[in-house]
Amino acid sequence: MANEREQNHPTIYLFTDGASSGNPGPGGYGIVLKCAGIEKEISGGFSLTTNNRMELMAVIIGLEAIKWKNARVEVYSDSSYVVKALNEDWLATWERRGFTKVKNVDLWTRFIPLYRSHNVTFHWIKGHAGHPENERCDALAVAAGAGAIKNGIALPEDSGYKEEQNKIL
């Protein structure tokens, strides 16, 4: 019965963007969640990270913000990296191969159970093309990353990025 009720929730629209000033550099993510006339914005940043990490982090944080199980979620992202990983089955291949030679494994393994707990569809949208939610997510991401640094706000370390770099060195 509870599962029936959960499936009757309205669709959640998740708009995401990630940014870094330099690649790597200070970076941030921006999220706009919309559902049944309600809108929520989320953002955060790190002192040293990459744009791809922030693009994926935006989706992860957005999915973590959803409290329903089995929610219908439409994700809109300008990240080919994230969208193609799902829509072109890159993620399934990476997982099958044990994530050998794959970057951002810490984030992908955090993403997988979130993705599987909902009914998620990914849509690629062109960035910086006047899409209002994408433009807002971009502004949130830039403000949370490079903008915070410019304003003297100390950002946390992206420990996953640091660990990945230590493996390479």
Residue ranges and their predicted role:
Residues 16-26, 60-136, 140, 145, ...:
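RNase H catalytic domain
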Residues 1-2, 128:
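N-terminal hydrophobic targeting segments
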Residues 2-53, 57, 63-71, 147-157, ...:
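RNase H-like nuclease fold core
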